[in-house]
């Protein structure tokens, strides 16, 4: 991979008011590997991808992802995520119970619970508002 396209706050490009944005993200996810590019698409709510107005594009985005990193979610959000990827009951319960820094990492058929550790220097680099 020689290029990474990162989309944070993906909800801005999704939803019934922005079908073109949802199509764009789905096409990027489908075609990125062909152009030696990786795509990182970030959102806080799986419902951004599972809403009926964008479920087709949402499934395409998840179906073409090589990796998922799922941090703690509430019950409804876990249910929404279940519309996009296969989760067993143990994984669903675990995601609801995750503490800060805990996540489910999915790579193909391999799944593992991980702990994301951040150093003080890394945390300080984000400042009090999440950025510089």
PLM ranges: what are they?
Residues 1, 95-132:
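Conserved P-loop NTPase motor module
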Residues 1-94, 120:
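Conserved P-loop NTPase motor cores
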């Amino acid at each position: 991979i020689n290029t990474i396209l990162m989309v944070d706050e993906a909800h801005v490009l999704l939803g019934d008011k922005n079908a073109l944005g949802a199509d764009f993200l789905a096409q990027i996810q489908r075609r990125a590997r062909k152009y030696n590019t990786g795509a990182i698409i970030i959102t806080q709510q799986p419902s951004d991808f599972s809403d009926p107005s964008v479920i087709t594009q949402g499934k395409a985005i998840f179906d073409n992802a090589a990796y998922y990193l799922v941090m703690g979610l509430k019950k409804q959000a876990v249910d929404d995520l279940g519309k996009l990827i296969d989760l067993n009951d143990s994984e669903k319960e675990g995601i609801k119970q995750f503490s800060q820094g805990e996540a489910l990492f999915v790579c193909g058929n391999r799944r593992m619970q991980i702990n994301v550790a951040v150093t003080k220097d890394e945390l300080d680099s984000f400042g009090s508002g999440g950025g510089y």
